[in-house]
Structure formats: structure tokens, C-alpha cells
Amino acid sequence: GAKRKNSRLSGNLEPFQCLNIDFRGRSDLKTLYLAEPCEVFNDFKGSENLYSAFYINELINFLITQSEESAELFDIYKNCISNLKDKKSIENILRNFELDLLGVLGYEINFSTEYGTNNDIDFEQKYKYSPQSGFSKSASGFDGKILNEISKRSFSREALIASKEINRKTIEYYFEELNIKSRVFFKWF
């Protein structure tokens, strides 16, 4: 196999390495015939970035069916991994990826309008969030100003925290019983 010590492919099979691949087979189990790097391999600048990349991989493995192909999703993934390797703001990268992933899968969150009324989110109001219906006015919850920031992807610290909560709630609602192992690593940081 490709993982054998003497395999001509083994040197190219690195985690998070962009590859041009060719595989063949009739069943779900395919044989890898070609694995060539698309670009120069860059390692992650820190362990927190690497653990974030593991989280991204886990999300994709749990949320995408094995036979599903998506050039748009691949571009989002590749951009996310590239940004993580450059040691940019990890929280920004992860929140953007989660929002993009939900959008590609058809579960895009509407941060601009109130549920049931189609009124714009009011900056002066608070809103509660439900994955099945969206945002509705409430005595407590998320500030409309913060929801606007998330909508524009200009994340303040508060917007990052709110986006993380909203994204997690949405992912767990639509994809029950996710057991994301990489979250355990973040408890150490």
C-alpha cells in the first residue's frame, strides 16, 4: 500500500498537504495510483493551529458523505488550512469556516432579518436564536449590533464568542451526536 516504507507515494502523504491524486476501484475501497504535491508543503506555526486543522477535518468527515464532491467546499477548506498555517487569528478562521461550511451544506444562518417578520435586525434589540427558525426579539440574548458584525464577518471579541455559540448550536441541531474529539485539545489552552 501507499503507506509502506518503500512506496513511491509515501513521501507525499502528509496531513494537510494539497495533492493531485488518482485512485481507481469499483467499490468504496479504492487504490491510490498517484499522489503529487500541488504546492510547497508548509508546516503549522503552532500546536493550537494544528489542533484547529484537526477540528476542521473532523467537521468535514462528520458532515460530508463519502461520495460527495464539492469544489466550493474544497476551496473553503484549502483557504482555511492555508490561513491556519500562516498563524493568523485562529478564532476568525474557525468561525468563518463554520459559517461557510453551513452555507455550502444549505444551512446558512440569516443574521440580517428577524424570523417571521422579515424586518432587519435592530441594533438596539436583543435576540434569541433557534436553528430551525432564526433570530427573534427577546428580553435577553444576542445584541443586534453583534449579529450585524457577524453578518459582515467583522468580528469583535464579543462577535467571535456569539458566532461560536450560534455555529455550535446550529451544527449540533442539524447533525446530532457529533463527537468532535479535537475540542478536547483546546481545553488545554
Regions found by a protein language model. Give the residues of each.
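Non-catalytic alpha-helical scaffolds and adjoining flexible linkers that form interface surfaces
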Residues: G1-F189
